[in-house]
Amino acid sequence: MIEFDEIPDLKTITDGEAEALCARLRSGVVDMVSRTGGHLASNLGVVELTVALHRVFDTGRDRLVFDVGHQCYIHKILTGRGGAMGTLRTFGGLSGFPKPKESVHDAFIAGHASNSVSVALGMARARTLLGEDYHVAALIGDGALTGGLAYEGLSNAGLSREPLLVILNDNGMSITKNVGGVAQHLAHQRLKPQYLRFKKGYRKAMSVLPGGRTIYRVTHKVKTAVKETLLPCSLFEDMGFTYLGPVDGHDVRGLTRLLRYAKDIEGPVLLHIRTVKGKGYPPAERNPDAYHGVSKFCVQTGEPLRPSGASYSGAFGAALCQLAEEDRRVCAITAAMRDGTGLKGFEERFPNRFFDVGISEGHAVAMAAGLAKQGCVPVFAVYSSFLQRGYDMLLHDVAILGLHVVFGVDRAGLVGEDGETHHGLFDVAYLSSVPGMTLYAPSSFAEVGTMLRYALTACDGPAALRYPRGGEGDYHGDAGTVPTLVAREGQGITLVTYGATYPALLAAAEQLEGAGCRPEIIKLNRLCPLDLEPVCRSVSKTGRLLVAEEVAAMGSVGERLCAGLAEAGVVPRAVRLCNTGRGFVPQGTVDQLRRLCGLDSQSLYEAAMEVWKHE
């Protein structure tokens, strides 16, 4: 394995040394990710680009903004964090995404898509307003360009005339079509060093000669007319960018030269590079999607060390396929997360009823509204943290009309190693705020099927199921037919929970019984609208309440239960709301984070004992 802390001075190395470094980095990243897990294919695709960027720019002063941030590992290695890469995505270790709190070289946080150009433009404008001197660059992939926010940023940046470099990493061949040999030859000629030097010198000479500015404008118009005759009109040039490319994204020499040229251009520049996702590791090149995010694996075979088991996503996808067999109006939507949300089987069985809209959650919700308005039953499967991006459309396009759109809210709760940007801790709050919303929380695979059937067949307006990442816990039952279940009668304290926290609370209850307390346990299956009557009746009897839930404190079910109890005139002697608190939760394994938040069985037992003993 490469010693990542042995990185040469990138400003002084030769092109040959840079190429050798790229080979070492690529090999080292494969070895490192095989041990830690993480995002592999995207990082292998940007090795040469990242080395070239660090040869040209000073990221301690210049601002490099990553879109999504999956591809930041090489950047971290080159900025003094190589020795800590073994801690990647672990509790207290390096983040798998850019993080300004971690290093001055990380200009901005990343995790969600399509925002990099907007952020970079803001930084460029701040530089101008404050009279400072540094370069600003945004690195965005062709996948992130499927999000409308990217085009909003590009449109505004092109009009701004701010010196700003946007690097488009095109690894999917989805941005430009093959435009023929003449066009490719001209693009190649336009990027030759001789042409770039002549272009720069010609503009400079014309600016000082008498009448030179007029001559330059005329010749520039002639050149543009010829180019537009032979080349297709560039979207980016129409937006106001100086467009360079497409070029080989694995040529570190050429990239270094182009970046040095591009950073001196006055105004916005778009450098279009073509890369191979998974470059240099054959299994990842053959199947880049499978090696996008990986667990620990064997480098020789590419096989995971621990095969993944059954998951909530898989249970959701299987249940949806069954319901789609019964009702031809049912269709499925994903925002570039077909496999992650368990919809691969649905696409194979019902290709005409499956829609992948790209990284466009707002569009997905609005399109679902259109489908529902015309009689279909759309189901949008989406990660909890990404559904946040479609909240306005959920309110405006779905809820006001009371349209029957169903949301499969995957990765609800703590998701683990991806950290703050990916935990699903806010969906209960924002979904419960939507008028007419019905929100379910299954605690087992069986309940996923039962509750999804209810959402599709028994709800008139918007409905949602929230379920966690990974597999089910020790509870495998199906109580999904009732809104609120009194799972165990008792006295002394009422324990309330739902979803993935239910098994931990059952384990805590067993410990309580061993200590002489027989708690009453209430399992909430429907979180919105809440069925308060069983909770009011129970708390009136026990006098004490503990609510455990894997969500943020503000807008939690516990807060709504307390408000409902107060309105009903039920005042418990002691209350404890166990949740993830008011701050952001860091990265770590789900078990580590549950202990951190006090949501593991032992912590819940200790909290319940304190409430029970309260006089």
Which residues are covered by each model-predicted region?
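N-terminal amphipathic, basic-rich helices that act as targeting or association modules
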Residues: 1-78, 235-256, 269-275
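Extended, hydrophobic alpha-helical segments in both membrane/secreted and soluble proteins
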Residues: 136, 140-153, 342, 354, ...
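Cofactor-binding active-site loop characterized by glycine-rich and histidine/acidic residues
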Residues: 39-160, 329-330, 334-335, 343-344
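Glycine-rich, histidine-containing beta strand-loop boundary motifs that form or position
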Residues: 44, 66-68, 140-141, 168-170, ...
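Thiamine diphosphate
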Residues: 87-119, 129-133, 159-290, 304-319, ...
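Short alpha-helical segments and helix-capping/turn motifs at coil-helix boundaries
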Residues: 34, 46-55, 119-124, 148-155, ...
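Helix-enriched interaction subdomains in cytosolic or periplasmic regions
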Residues: 296-298, 432-475
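Glycine- and acidic
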Residues: 6-11, 15, 30-38, 102-108, ...
